[in-house]
Amino acid sequence: MITTEIKRVKNHINGEWVESTGTEVEAVPNPATGKIIAYVPLSPKEDVEKAVEAAKAAFETWSKVPVPNRSRNLYKYLQLLQENKDELAKIITLENGKTLTDATGEVQRGIEAVELATSAPNLMMGQALPNIASGIDGSIWRYPIGVVAGITPFNFPMMIPLWMFPLAIACGNTFVLKTSERTPLLAERLVELFYEAGFPKGVLNLVQGGKDVVNSILENKDIQAVSFVGSEPVARYVYETGTKHGKRVQALAGAKNHAIVMPDCNLEKTVQGVIGSAFASSGERCMACSVVAVVDEIADEFIDVLVAETKKLKVGDGFNEDNYVGPLIRESHKERVLGYISSGVADGATLLVDGRKINEEVGEGYFVGATIFDGVNQEMKIWQDEIFAPVLSIVRVKDLEEGIKLTNQSKFANGAVIYTSNGKHAQTFRDNIDAGMIGVNVNVPAPMAFFAFAGNKASFFGDLGTNGTDGVQFYTRKKVVTERWF
């Protein structure tokens, strides 16, 4: 339930809500108003150790629960998430700031991830080949790996945790979850509903906090694997530190997603697609379009329509259904984004839509409106860096080949999109672009949960992505059995 009461957030360890053993807390404001809605503990190492101990003890019995029985628990959890989806969306808007429309979409994508987890028995099946030699059979079996941990960001406080712990738990593991200290309330509700579904205590544990919790997870000898989503520098740190301590790690990192606009595109749908990708969720998502490479032949027409439509977007509290762009997560992030806008102007880019000029009626929240730059080049910071905001850079290119070359010069390679009605253009793009997830006339090429989610280059550290068969392989260990009976 959403109330006006300022909440003191707790950890959930071994089936119980408990106060952190530490004394340090951090205020959690509503990004749309700046008013404090909660205090979250910055838990110390001792809290992580207790959570791991609980998960380790629970693993001894949970890993032996028949696979169909584990799925039945997840079906109950899925039902509870569906029954409470309106409340969950409102919590997201309250603490994250994204519009209620965007939050509702996130809830649905999270539910779809749990739907995938319920099918884990099928995805976990091994392989067998009889009579590989005289009287000898061979087979591959998949087993859970033990205690695993997830470290998740503020921008998708429901979807990303649900990529992780339901599938890991369906595979027979137990879990320690550390969500962003900026969005702790949704995590609490996810855990409450999880235990309402009848899971045994200790199967899922929640430890709130900051970098001390992260370091404790990475260094704890009883945690076998770590899933992470966040910025590129932190992802690199998590991967290097976790693997140094002998852990299996998947670390999904930053992005600078490009869209190539061809002269043969459907102009109206392309403009609306770019707007949705660049400015929905205030641009705070790793699959947002942040650069458009538009072919010269259509550039002026495309830009004119894009600017006109963007100027219609309203900025404000996400609970107001008229608003399209909500606040950024924190005042510090807003100041960082304003710095990038100033940098773009100083570097000589043309500011076509200035998100700094927004209606004063938006109040005291952390607002930056949709922003568009033209005349951007690869030497500018606004092209190079992940800004994580509703800031779009336009680069004019002569043809598809130049657009592909531009895109591939980025150090990131998460997602990329082409807008075209030409199958040959789409095929050339697909085969030559360096990105983990590719869209053809698809605004945000984030795959459904039954496909793997992972980028390339500085957008991903590890071997196996989240979701789909990648996720099952990450959360399980293979045993190859060769057997003969006399």
Swiss-Prot record:
Its EC number is 1.2.1.27. The keyword NAD applies. It catalyses: 3-oxopropanoate + NAD(+) + CoA + H2O = hydrogencarbonate + acetyl-CoA + NADH + H(+); 2-methyl-3-oxopropanoate + NAD(+) + CoA + H2O = propanoyl-CoA + hydrogencarbonate + NADH + H(+). The keyword Flavoprotein does not apply. It comes from the Bacteria. It is an enzyme of class 1 (oxidoreductase). Pfam families: Aldedh (PF00171). Belongs to the aldehyde dehydrogenase family. IolA subfamily. This is Malonate-semialdehyde dehydrogenase. It comes from Bacillus cereus (strain G9842). The gene is iolA.
